Amino acid sequence: MRLTQAFVRSAAYERRFLAKNPWDLAMVLWIPLATVLLIWWIFSQTQISDLPIGVIDQDQSPMANTLVRYLEASPDITIANFYNSPAAAKDGILQRDVYALVIIPENFSRNILSGKPSPIILQVNAQYGTHSGIIQKGVQSVAGTLSAGVEIQRLVKQGISPTQAAIAYSPINIQRTSLFNAATNYQQFLASTVIPALLHILAMVIGATTIGRELRDKQLGRWYRFIEGRSSKLSLATDDIVSTKNSANNHLTSSSVSNSNNIKDQSSRTNLTAPIAAVTKSVSISVLLAGLAGKYCWPALAYSLWALLAIWLATPQYPTAPSSLLATYIGLVLLMMLSLWLGAIFTLASFSLRAGLSATGFISAPSYAFAGVTFPYIAISDGAKHWSDMLPLTYYLKLHIAQLQMHAPLAVSLSIVYGLALATIIAMLLTALLSKRALANPQRWGAR
């Protein structure tokens, strides 16, 4: 009963604060919702196509015109402009009007007809890795198609049948089979993994600010006294401020009235802020755990809903096993809970909301880069691997990709779910211990 009371009173305490502070409420409700929908809308075009390139045609021959038509027909690229000089083309690349330049050299057609090598020059802005890779693939495909057609026509003129000419031109073929994400769906590849990463950041920020503002405003003791049932007033800090202002106004009116009000104000302060030593000596870890659970129940519930929305959006069009969906959702909810507790730990450990937010940003913001989604995990340095192995987002994304995109057996990812659950429990216990330490050191409250 005592723990239930602590949970309910702490939840009511936090609900009242959120109702009176729209920005904090927005961090729980509207900002994560807008983030999820915005990221999904940004990647609504699931495939990259029609990347603009420029062309310098120095040959002006029918064969060069054929190459230009092939380039324009490629789904990956589109010809945005024809340039007359390399200088003009360079300006186009620098201004990002085009991402690459195809140069058709002089005597292109003559060299082909005479059987001499006739290269196509591709200059690509490799600063944009994804763009350049797609453009290189598209131009190489066009060049291969045109080259095959020219060679097969030459062999047919020599009396070889078209079928034999095709085999003679390319006796070894590559049969490429994409096992996962065969359509190169960037919404499935990037958006579905970026959303959990951003929710991870927001949850850590909320975790830091929810307990951090109690330290900053020197209200941690009042909060604990309220959840423990020693005070029946919900808005303790507000009542204290009002009584202080009234005391100051009465002092200006009359010294006798002021003395009386000062005595009342002093007794009121004594009742509101009972001796801190008496509070800290009787701090119960179980009550703290229940109070912290109630304090964080609203962001936990909200982010469980956003996790459900993220999983629903990330679910591929083809069927996914219910067990895989459930395991992924549980993993994401555990990641959100762990993020809340980690944010609280960083703030409580430093006794400073500012330091807690700094640590939160330092750890959560770049965690996606170390998770092995955009850059291969096996290719990073050993030091980066050790750092990646300490980040909870790394393990969740392994679970996410394995279950939703690779359809791996559930047993492959169960260890990650168990690990996240254990880490969440440990983080919650550590938060309670650090809260007890903070209650025992009131002289360190008030740091920004």
Which role does the model predict for each range below?
Residues L301, L305-R448:
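Membrane-spanning alpha-helical segments of multipass transporters and channels
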Residues M1-A11, S282, G383-P392:
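Short, membrane-interfacial amphipathic segments enriched in basic
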Residues R16, L179, N185-S192, P196, ...:
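Cytosol-facing boundaries of transmembrane alpha helices in integral membrane proteins
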